[in-house]
Amino acid sequence: MNEEEKYLFDLNGYLVVENVLTPEEVAKANEAIDHHLDQGRLRPREQTLDGGSPELWGDKGRGELGGLLNWEEPWCNPFREMLAHPGLVPYLNEILGKGFRMDHHLFLLWMDKGAEGFIFHGSSGPGFDPNQYYIFRNGRMHNGLTVATFQLTDVNPGDGGLIVIPGSHKSNFPCPQEMRLYQKHQEHIRQVTCKAGDVVIFTEAVTHGTLPWTADHPRRSILTRYTAGNLAYVPAYPMPEWANERQRAVLEPPYHTRLDRPVLDE
């Protein structure tokens, strides 16, 4: 993570890392999803995420598909390789510190044309959330829960998808409700554009949400959340037999690096 990238992450609370996945890796991941998409679910209307905002309304819910790491081979391989991808590890080492761990199992989030948006959320504002935070001390950033999103399709201007309030991870006041509903102050809100193969990294402390999806092609994002090695948001899970040394390092339960926790340098 170079000095420019550190500055941009500190400034905005997120960073787009380009071309982490090769076109071949993207194609294999999409092929695996096509093979299993009938196992996914569309979020039902009674579980709507739009917060009652007409600006975020959609005629359908977003799609969600889990269990990717446990699919049969070769379909599982593209996603297992994402866990400790060499193009991602150096960024997480800087953002979370060496010895970081995966806290939430990765899953596919997809949006077809017309899918609803998601009201703004995040842990910025008054008070301190010990799970989701951003602190800068002694020349280093310290983050709680952090999201890495592998993009499997392009997100172009106007398509919808992920939106953030840049810099809100350092805000000291609550986000106004009309802004959370995307009804006011849109000039301070940014749609995050990216290409298939890019990874979007953001701290859960930054205020973020999604806009309804308007593109003819689907949005496909592989989401997982990482945290410092000694922290946990969700309960730990059994170590899978298939994990290699790199994958085991990020699947370890939470404990401090001084207790010989395995770390990845790259």
PLM features per residue range, with description:
Residues 131-138, 187-188:
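Short, P/G- and charge-enriched loop/turn segments at secondary-structure junctions
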Residues 7, 141-211, 231, 246-249:
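Double-stranded beta-helix
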Residues 39-52, 175-179, 196-199, 206-266:
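Non-heme Fe(II)/2-oxoglutarate
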Residues 16-17, 203:
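Phosphate-binding beta-loop-alpha motif at adenosine-nucleotide cofactor sites
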Residues 118-124, 165, 207-210, 224:
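Histidine-centered catalytic micro-motifs
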Residues 1-11, 18-134, 255:
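Non-heme Fe(II)-dependent double-stranded beta-helix
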Residues 104-107, 148-150, 222-226:
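A structural signal for short, well-ordered beta-strand segments
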Residues 85, 136-143:
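Short, glycine/small-residue-enriched coil/turn segments at secondary-structure junctions
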